[in-house]
UniProtKB/Swiss-Prot annotation:
Its EC number is 7.3.2.2. It is found in: Cell inner membrane. The keyword DNA damage does not apply. It is a peripheral membrane protein. GO terms for molecular function: ABC-type phosphonate transporter activity; ATP binding; ATP hydrolysis activity. Belongs to the ABC transporter superfamily. Phosphonates importer (TC 3.A.1.9.1) family. It comes from Escherichia coli (strain K12). Phosphonates utilization is cryptic in strain K12. It catalyses: phosphonate(out) + ATP + H2O = phosphonate(in) + ADP + phosphate + H(+). This is Phosphonates import ATP-binding protein PhnC. The complex is composed of two ATP-binding proteins (PhnC), two transmembrane proteins (PhnE) and a solute-binding protein (PhnD). PROSITE patterns: ABC_TRANSPORTER_1, ABC_TRANSPORTER_2, PHNC.
Length: 262
């Protein structure tokens, strides 16, 4: 099975606090993987490293590879990092859309990397690009909102627009950081259904950070759980039982309670 993401000996320190400890991870083509863990476990930090949004410590031997290209090595971004990012869709918890633009215009932003610079200066997109953007919106059930400002949409609708933008980008990997954290249950279900549909029918690899264990178990065949910056569990979601759940979350809660009591 083809390895799409390879992480070796990744460490990260923030203000003398080590957020990641020599993390090793391989993710294969077509997988839908949930990164789980309590707040502060390092899951979002790990996800940001995968696309080079942040760099790791200058650790000997640390290396991240995405789609066969080096993203960063020993704390330094690769010179051709843009080539890796060109095929990586990143979905943020807070949507990261341009409120003053329409839904369609926001989706077209996904084509900027493949559009000549002079065209991007004037937002001149081709008819073919606009058609692809409409197809992406149809895919996520948002085509009827194409000419509406994104500022008028609900959180769940905005998240689906962000997914359509990743499709417009022709992403081979989607990295989603807490995409349902601020959504109501029905909106969260629709967003996760959309990500799973893209994964299963398009073969796009999806890595998603989640707080909600039930969604991870329902939508992702594989779980990578982090605890205090270490990989605590990496395996089938079916094998992530109550005992592992308790050890991952409740032991952390006890540490926090003891710290408050002290």
């Amino acid at each position: 099975m083809q390895t799409i993401i390879r992480v070796e000996k990744l460490a990260k320190t923030f203000n003398q606090h080590q957020a990641l400890h020599a993390v090793d991870l391989n993710i294969h083509h077509g997988e839908m993987v949930a990164l789980l863990g309590p707040s502060g476990s390092g899951k979002s930090t790990l996800l940001r490293h995968l696309s080079g949004l942040i760099t790791g410590d200058k650790s000997v031997g640390s290396h991240i590879e995405l789609l066969g290209r080096t993203v960063q090595r020993e704390g330094r971004l690769a010179r051709d990092i843009r080539k890796s990012r060109a095929h990586t869709g990143y979905i943020f918890q807070q949507f990261n859309l341009v409120n003053r633009l329409s839904v369609l215009e926001n989706v077209l932003i996904g084509a900027l990397g493949s559009t000549p610079f002079w065209r991007t200066c004037f937002s001149w997109f081709t008819g073919e690009q606009k058609q692809r953007a409409l197809q992406a919106l149809t895919r996520v059930g948002m085509v009827h909102f194409a000419h509406q400002r994104v500022s008028t949409l609900s959180g769940g609708q905005q998240q689906r627009v962000a997914i359509a933008r990743a499709l417009m980008q022709q992403a081979k990997v989607i990295l989603a950081d807490e995409p349902i954290a601020s959504l109501d249950p029905e909106s969260a279900r629709i967003v996760m259904d959309t990500l799973r549909d893209i994964n299963q029918n398009d073969g796009i690899t999806v890595v998603v950070t989640l707080h909600q264990v039930d969604y991870a178990l329902r939508y992702c065949e594989r779980i990578v759980a982090l605890r205090q910056g270490h990989v605590f569990y990496d395996g089938s979601s079916q094998q992530f039982d109550n005992e592992r759940f308790d050890h991952l979350y409740r032991s952390i809660n006890r540490v926090e309670e003891n710290a408050k009591a002290a």
